């Protein structure tokens, strides 16, 4: 029995007619998978081509830049990489100085290190806080200065641990102020009144008199004075404590600003949006940066301007079940309209995006899930949807 006969045996006429198309599509999928594997290998080779060089060389500068990106993406995972490339030693004092300088570092990533309760992190928090010069600085401005050097974590235990260290260092540098317990009470009071006065979800804003009344027990214990409460209230009511990621010193929208506030960065593959392309759309490797409610993508990691910007407003995100690309997810419009976005054309023109869905592919399952989670967190303050996986055929 011939292989040709065996292959077609038992097939209907319709199935026999369809078979060549199936074979052709199978061949296309094999080619696409192989192309993706090649692109992934190229990315891995680029990331692996890192080696020790002289601190003043151009190659070393590239290593430092790459190290900052890794730290911003996953600070704990990056520590060994940074130490092995002689960027910063895995030592609390060295890391504290590096984070205090803060050049190109995400303040959220710094806060992630400082808020941890591992012994290494606690020692780093101590060294980092002691690097702040708080002598003869009033406590409220001192706390502003301190909290602007990183982003305070959201968990109450981490906040309290960081404020305790600040209070300890402040009291040591200002012996005439009082003890660390009193400094901690004032610092915590700053955070509390900042929330009461400036959080839009708090409808009943307390007056100074009401605020003093709320702290009656602390006053009775001598943990704080009316003068200190008044100083805190008047300062914070005029100028709220700004989260570092809410402000910029380098001009909002510049690459430096985008990278400074980056929550995640890395190589991903974006489906081509060329409407003239026939058949399956091509995939392009792009350097993606998640920053300040936007997803930026660049042709190269070192580009000065983004190729495109996707605004994460009124959008959802979900995994896409696609056998040919198992690590795909998509950002889609919740209103069935166009997603607010823009891109730079080849002639340099900036044009508005015209898409309701952006399909993106990661290199592995872990990377895909990390991106989905990071984008979901970025969308959390807004109305968003983390949808069930979507199947494609």
UniProtKB/Swiss-Prot annotation:
One GO term of the cellular component aspect?
midbody
Q: Which GO terms describe its molecular function?
A: guanyl-nucleotide exchange factor activity
Sorted alphabetically, the Gene Ontology BP terms of this entry are: regulation of ARF protein signal transduction
Q: Which SMART domains match?
A: PH, Sec7
- Cited Pfam families: PH, Sec7
Q: Which UniProt keywords apply?
A: Coiled coil, Guanine-nucleotide releasing factor
Outline the extent of the SEC7 domain. 53-239
Query: PH domain: from which residue to which, for each copy?
Result: 261-377
Which residues does the annotated region (Disordered) include? 1-21
The task this protein performs is described as: Promotes guanine-nucleotide exchange on ARF. Promotes the activation of ARF through replacement of GDP with GTP. Plays a role in cell shedding during embryogenesis, probably by promoting the endocytosis of cell adhesion molecules.
What's the protein here called?
GTP exchange factor for ARFs 1
Record the organism: Caenorhabditis elegans
Lineage of this protein's species? Eukaryota, Metazoa, Ecdysozoa, Nematoda, Chromadorea
